[in-house]
């Protein structure tokens, strides 16, 4: 990704200002312009996420109407395409409470998939932390939640979101969103750190030649989850529209808006992506710790997270229809204040993107992400570690940018995997 280096003349005066809090009116306007464009890009990204989710929903309709290998593959392909713009929105999660409070409905993971459907015996039959570990709501029209019988005869969107999602207060009870749909399309990946993704047969939805029973309820669940994904993304698209709640919140105070941008960049880079999504799985050599674990699409999701982080700095975004958005950006703001710091930030973002692209290329041509993190895979481990190192290194420069813009103390997300690795094994 090439970061735009064209400086706007109005930003030149920033170099002489001592602190953002004391900027003259015209420079404050420039900070406001950066935040405004940040919100505009958010709206475009969520709108693209909505568009691709609608395409996924249509593909699911076509699959359920005529179950077969081709229609199932088309639904899987639509799911993978839908992940691209959504993962590029994740940089908006941290620093924007409206997004953080909402995102668990669409991208929560990992999930205890036995809540939803049948599982292999290797999954186990119980969990000390989750009484619904093998509830299999598709097979059971009544389930117990907090010791009480709950009617599960209708697997409606309202039931999934209002009753089943995080049932019993357990975060692993993920009933909605991309990963619930992923499980219903692919099934469990039973290959460990060996090759291969989930292999759910299309006949799991074939009412005339049903496998694993309850094909009608499985279809009902899949359609309800897809319907919810569309409606949830519509909500966030509206929140980032001009005058939407998220837009109003971030634009109300330009300085706080800049802090939100950098909080997103730093927290996603360090604690969430480098730590929880990558280093943890690498330390444990555990395929269950990969983000898109049923589909083996994890390397693409991580790459698009990194693209989103870089875009939050550059202000650039290429929409799913090919339209390119550019505008006032942190890159411009930092370059006008400290050219060397901007060059450092740009170089580190690009180095991380190079490492992520190398990981994605390996995922496409040699081995999938769950194989890369396998124990004893020195070369694969090193490819993943290089991407982690890039994320950690760019976070250090994000912290320098925060200081240069005089944004005060910003607490970025951490991770035991990075900060206290011994705790991971306790």
Q: What is the predicted function of each stretch?
A:
Residues 2-12:
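Bacterial N-terminal signal peptides that target proteins for export
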Residues 10-21:
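Bacterial N-terminal signal peptides
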Residues 21-27:
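Sec/Tat signal peptide C-region and signal peptidase I cleavage site
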Residues 28-426:
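Mature extracytoplasmic or organellar-lumen-exposed domains after removal of signal/transit peptides
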